[in-house]
Amino acid sequence: MNSTHFLVRKDQLSTTALRGTPAAALPDGQIRVRVDKFALTSNNITYAAFGEAMAYWQFFPVSPTLLGGDQSNTWGRIPVWGFGSVTESHHPEVAVGERLYGYFPMSSTVDLTPTRVSAGALSDGAPHRAELHAVY
């Protein structure tokens, strides 16, 4: 499955791009989530406007390969609150088909590394999120 990503230029928020990527093999311990629906509100504009100062751009960093070169510091993915469905799982505590509500990128899919999994919640334990606020 391909994934589509809505990118925003960090220094010029009205400059945007759509980029597609083929799905990579999912490593052990990760899940792939299809972002089904998300809300676009004034909060999202705040996330973009204060992305550097408040570290919002760091939640879903742009891979250099997504832009065909190292422009990853120039572009970002605005975080959104929404609903997703697990389409692939290599994690023993998360089943394919589970529905999730949470903090996602403006992308059609996202790969997560579930930690602190319980009956009603999980956190993304991706290394780049280790220093970021846990509520997101």
Model-identified regions with their sequence ranges:
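Short, solvent-exposed secondary-structure boundary/capping segments
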Residues: 45-47, 97, 121-122
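Short, compositionally biased
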Residues: 111-134
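A eukaryote-biased signal for short, well-structured alpha-helical docking elements
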Residues: 1-4
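A short N-terminal beta-strand-loop micro-motif at the entrance of redox/enzyme domains
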Residues: 9-38, 42-45, 49
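Glycine-rich beta-strand-centered segment in the early N-terminal region that forms part
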Residues: 24-39, 52-116
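Active-site region of chymotrypsin-like
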Residues: 74, 133-136
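A composition-driven signal for long, intrinsically disordered, charge-rich low-complexity tracts
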Residues: 7-8, 81
